[in-house]
Amino acid sequence: MYAVIVTGGKQHKVTEGEFLKVEKLDIATGEAIDFDRVLLVANGDDVKIGLPVVEGAKVTAEVVSHGRHDKVRIIKFRRRKHHMKRQGHRQWFTEIKITGIQA
């Protein structure tokens, strides 16, 4: 059984027991969270597609940890001017474990 959920402006295909890194959520480590925006639920040949969400479907998860991704390097360069600006960015994430899918 799997589902497609929306969180942080992105769509994620999830299965029960899976660990997933999503955009940072303001929830303490160890707490449970429910995702109500479920776009699709599939159990074998039984597929439910929402318009836009599946009514009554819910995905539950547990917050495992918070952290930051690897650094992304940004270089702004102006040709012929000997000008370079280097910058880096590390995006925050929340790691969750999917504990249940209810449809």
Curated annotation (Swiss-Prot):
GO molecular function, one term: structural constituent of ribosome
Pfam families in the cross-refs: Ribosomal_L21p
UniProt record, GO biological process: translation
Alphabetical list of PROSITE patterns matching this protein: RIBOSOMAL_L21
SUPFAM superfamilies xrefs: L21p-like
Highest taxon in the source lineage: Bacteria
Keyword Ribonucleoprotein included in the entry's annotation: yes
GO cellular component: cytoplasm; ribonucleoprotein complex; ribosome
InterPro entries from the UniProt entry: bL21-like (IPR028909), bL21-like_sf (IPR036164), Ribosomal_bL21 (IPR001787), Ribosomal_bL21_CS (IPR018258)
Keywords annotated in UniProt: Ribonucleoprotein, Ribosomal protein, RNA-binding, rRNA-binding
Keyword 4Fe-4S: no
Quaternary structure and interacting proteins, as annotated: Part of the 50S ribosomal subunit. Contacts protein L20.
Function (record text): This protein binds to 23S rRNA in the presence of protein L20.
Protein family membership: Belongs to the bacterial ribosomal protein bL21 family.
Protein name (Swiss-Prot/TrEMBL): Large ribosomal subunit protein bL21
Organism expressing this protein natively: Pseudomonas paraeruginosa (strain DSM 24068 / PA7)
Gene label: rplU
